[in-house]
Amino acid sequence: VAETVSKIKLANKPIPFPYRVHDQPDEDRLIPFVEFARKYGYHFQTKTPEQIANSFNEMLSKVQGLPEQRVLEQMGIRTMAKAIYTSKNIGHYGLGFEDYCHFTSPIRRYPDILVHRVLTSVLDGDPIVDKKMEQKCLHCSERERAAMETERASNKYKQVEFMKQFLGDEFDAVISGVASFGFWAETVDHKCEGFVSATSLLDYDDFIYYESEYALIGKRSNWAFRIGDPVKIKVISANLSKRQLDYEWILDLDFKPAQNKKKKK
């Protein structure tokens, strides 16, 4: 409430203000995701931003507790623009607010302080016109990204450190990412992500990356390694200095990779 009320105080005043904005989904990212979600039976209306938001909410509600929940949630997040701080208000698409800012939180951020200063000056009848507000917002956004990258690096380090004890062990996993040079898989038990190189798959087939399918597909076997697919992996390397986990795909006698549904041309 405080965050939206604070903006009302400034509604008709041309005062530089640190908004928290979130742009609409990028079409280039959205279309592949919509096609991917359709494979699981989820259909999107994309003519207007409101339809897109409603379709996302409907999917997120229906997918709860289903095997594809994690992959669709992760892929959905990746289609979204990143929220940033700026003095140029475009609204917050994700929250559905035309005007939004960060006022306070369990921790007090520097952007919160910027908001407090402007509001205090307005309430005191002597508004601050900070000509460097956009520069400060840019700095806040950059430091936020740096903090998130540091957090990811720290989490990855602890994952690698933890998985060192399991070298040579096999685990059930789920494919969490795919590229032309291999795929990433996250263990079901520990949520630790490692990489399976496409080179290590050459004994089985020559796999080609299909971006629209989010999949590596075998030339001869037509096997498909697709985001969200369950796999069996072996931990083969845990490099702390590089914060890197390497896995090897294990061909389970009771399991075969999914067959690609598209006919090969």
Give the location of each predicted region:
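Short beta-rich binding modules
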Residues: 213-223
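Eukaryotic intrinsically disordered and solvent-exposed regulatory patches
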Residues: 171, 220, 232
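Append "with occasional cross-activation on large, charged helical scaffolds in nucleic-acid assemblies
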Residues: 1-189, 195-197, 202-204, 208-210, ...
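OB-fold/S1-family single-stranded nucleic acid-binding modules
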Residues: 223-264
